[in-house]
Each structure stands twice: as structure tokens, then as C-alpha cells.
Amino acid sequence: MKPISNPMGLSPTKQNVYDSVVLTTLQDVSNWVRLSSLWPLLYGTSCCFIEFASLIGSRFDFDRYGLVPRSSPRQADLIITAGTVTMKMAPSLVRLYEQMPEPKYVIAMGACTITGGMFSTDSYSTVRGVDKLIPVDVYLPGCPPKPEAIVDAIIKLRKKVAQENGQDRLNQNQQHRCFSVTHRLQPVPAVHNGEYERNITRQVPSISLDSTLQSPFEQILQSSFESVSETTLIDSQRYDNQYLQGAEIETGGLE
């Protein structure tokens, strides 16, 4: 009995081909590619960045996640703000974030970056939360966070990137922000009001002294300089005379 040449069903060859084909969408492929190409922009302003620097070493080896530190915002898609952000540095941070290409992500690292930390109550120059300037994707609390915590934050960010939709990313709006305490500074009057310069001790002395002395100030200075010079001249002449007398005594003794 001869076997059927064209049996009903899939051939083994076609079955192997179907097993090797993966059906996906362009968005999923894009997310999968970006998982291993998160290039962080190093933005360390305080002590938290020391922990991030130890993450670059061989002990933790964050290169396995495809992280390549960059120094240019145009080549980075992840910025890790590590440390205190001051009022003067805020415009520079916003400009760096705007120069990064889309899609871009932010990790707020440390208590000082998230809420202002120990400077959140009585500091007039500290930004109380970097999310007031730029949108934050992952909050990493700690003072400072350990390198293991940084790795955990990167893993959570990778999960977010894997489930991301491009349209949702464009319509993203920062709504949930960390609570920060308002400052307790009391307004004080201005210090530089001119009172110090108008103080009598800061006034320039007049050219002449009291009118009862009948002697101008410049003449008194000149007379004091002349008396000092005369005293110096008399002392030098006296020293010369003593030196000559001593020399004559020594010469007479030799004779």
C-alpha cells in the first residue's frame, strides 16, 4: 500500500516554519529595542552621585542592562538627577531635559531631589522636588540610595518602557507629585539700607582738626614725619660715633 503523497494537514517543514515566526506589533518591537539602549545622562549635584559612580564599577556592572553613560543630552534618553537641585541650577536642568530627544525618562534619586531633603524647610535656595521642574518617571528614595536600589529602579523603568504606548507617552501629564513641606522662613527687612555707610565711624575724616588746635591735620603729619626722620638721623650719627671710638680704642691697644 502506497502512502498518500499529499496528506491533509501541515507538513513537518511548514510546522517548523510556523513555530519560528513571532507575531508582534511595531510598538512592541520599538519598546523591546529601547529596553537595552537606555543611555543615562550623568547629572550629579551632591553626595548621592557617589553611589551612582560605584554602580559603574565592575562589582555591580550596570552595562548588562545596556546603560552607556553619556555627557551630552542629545545622545541620552534617561537623566538621573542625583543630589540637591538649587534655584540657580533649575534653568540649566530644564534646558538639559528639553535638549534630550523623545522618548526620554527621568529618575529622581535621593531625598534631596524628591522633596528637598533636609533643606526642604529652612532653605531659600533649594527646589523642593525636581518634579516641579520636569516630569519624573521613577522615584528612588534614600539618603543616599544603595547601588542595588538604583538597579531596582532601572528594572522598574524597563518594565514601564516595555508596556508603554507611544500615544500615551505623548499625552503624558505629571499629576502625582511627592508631597513637600512649605518653607517656614519669616520675611526680614532689607539689610543693605545705607545705614552702615551713614554711620559716624564710616565717615571720612576732615582735612583739619578741631579749630581750637589751630593746626591743620596735614601739618601735624608732616611735623611727625620730620621728627621721626630727625630722631633716626641722630641715632645713626650716635651709632657711627660709638663705632669710631671703638675702632680707635682697638687700634691704640694694638700699638
Curated annotation (Swiss-Prot):
Q: What is the free-text note on the cofactor? A: Binds 1 [4Fe-4S] cluster.
The alphabetical list of record keywords is: 4Fe-4S, Chloroplast, Iron, Iron-sulfur, Membrane, Metal-binding, NAD, NADP, Plastid, Plastoquinone, Quinone, Thylakoid, Translocase, Transport
The principal location of this protein is plastid
Q: Which reaction does it catalyse?
A: a plastoquinone + NADH + (n+1) H(+)(in) = a plastoquinol + NAD(+) + n H(+)(out); a plastoquinone + NADPH + (n+1) H(+)(in) = a plastoquinol + NADP(+) + n H(+)(out)
| Binding annotation for [4Fe-4S] cluster | 47-48, 112, 143
Q: Which SUPFAM superfamilies match?
A: HydA/Nqo6-like (SSF56770)
**HAMAP family noted in UniProt:** NDH1_NuoB
Q: Which family does it belong to?
A: Belongs to the complex I 20 kDa subunit family.
**Matching NCBIfam families:** nuoB_fam (TIGR01957), PRK06411.1 (NF005012)
Q: What is this protein called?
A: NAD(P)H-quinone oxidoreductase subunit K, chloroplastic
Q: Which organism is it from?
A: Zygnema circumcarinatum
Q: Which gene encodes it?
A: ndhK
